[in-house]
Amino acid sequence: MASKASVAIVGSGNISTDLLYKLQRSEWLEPRWMIGIDPESEGLKRARGFGLETSHEGVDWLLGQDEKPDLVFEATSAYVHKAAAPRYEEAGIRAIDLTPAAVGPAVVPPANLRAHLDAPNVNMITCGGQATIPIVYAVSRVVEVPYAEIVASVASVSAGPGTRANIDEFTKTTSKGVEVIGGAKRGKAIIILNPADPPMIMRDTIFCAIPEDADRAAIAASIHDVVSQVQQYVPGYRLLNEPQFDEPSVVNGGNHVVTTFVEVEGAGDFLPPYAGNLDIMTAAATKVGEEIAKELLSAKVS
C-alpha cells in the first residue's frame, strides 16, 4: 500500500509554488509533478529542485502520461480549470480547485471539512473566503444572520496576474460562499488591493447582521472557537481585537451588527509573510487534500 497519495500541481505561479512547500511537509501527500505553461517560471525551477517531474506543456501533457496522480491541485485561472475539470474526472483524478471556477462544491475547513470528501472536484473558494467565511459560520451557528458583508484587503504586490484576472469571479464566488457555507441569508464580498509600500499584511473585516436579542457572549465564544480551529493550519491567523457589537444606525443599515477584524500572516514558505492571502489558500487546500488522501488510502487497503 502506498503511504501517501500522489499529487500533481497544475500552475506554476505564486500560489502553486507556495503550495509545493506545504505539500513537501505533508504526511499524506506526495507531490510528484508540477505543470505550467512558462518553461522559465520560478515555480517549475523550484519543483525540479525538489525532484518533481515538470512540464510547461499544460494539462495535455499530464493527462498523456502513463502514470497519473491520485489528486491534482490546480491554481491557474477560473476559465482554465473549467475546461480541465471534466478531463480530470474522466481520468479518475480527484481535483482540488484553488481558482474561483467553483466547478465542484466549496470547502472551508472549520465549516464543512468532511462534507465533500467523495466529490470528484472541490473548490477552495478564494483567499478572502477562506479568511472570512469561518467567522460568518461562527456567528450563524449561534444566531440567524440575515446579511453578512466581508472586506478583504491584501497587499497589491501579492496579487499576481491570475488574481487580477479573476476579480469578478472573486466577488461572486466569495459572496456565494458567505451564504452557502457561512450561513448568511445574503452575502456580499469586496476585495481591496492595497498598494502600500512596505506591503501590508492581509486584513479582513467581517460584518454580520444579528437579531436584537442575540446572545453576544455566545457569539464571541463561537468566533474564538473557530479562530482557534483555523490557527491549527494557519498559525498566523488571528483576531485583531474582540468582536464589536453595534446598535442599529444609518451607517449599518438599521441592523444590530457584530463586526470582526482579523489578519492573516503567512508562514513565509515561498512568499513573504505579508502574503497571508495566498498562505491561507494553500494551507486550507493542503488540509482538505490530506483528508481526501486519508479516505483514498484507507479505501485502497480495504
From Swiss-Prot:
Belongs to the acetaldehyde dehydrogenase family. HAMAP family: Ac_ald_DH_ac (MF_01657). SUPFAM superfamilies: Glyceraldehyde-3-phosphate dehydrogenase-like, C-terminal domain, NAD(P)-binding Rossmann-fold domains. NAD(+) binds at residues 12-15, 158-166, 277. It catalyses: acetaldehyde + NAD(+) + CoA = acetyl-CoA + NADH + H(+). GO terms for molecular function: acetaldehyde dehydrogenase (acetylating) activity; NAD binding. It comes from the Bacteria. It comes from Mycobacteroides abscessus (strain ATCC 19977 / DSM 44196 / CCUG 20993 / CIP 104536 / JCM 13569 / NCTC 13031 / TMC 1543 / L948). Keywords: Aromatic hydrocarbons catabolism, NAD, Oxidoreductase. Its EC number is 1.2.1.10. GO terms for biological process: catabolic process. Pfam families: AcetDehyd-dimer. InterPro entries: Acetaldehyde_dehydrogenase, Acetylaldehyde_DH_C, NAD(P)-bd_dom_sf, Semialdehyde_DH_NAD-bd. This is Acetaldehyde dehydrogenase 1. The active site is at residue 127. It is an enzyme of class 1 (oxidoreductase).
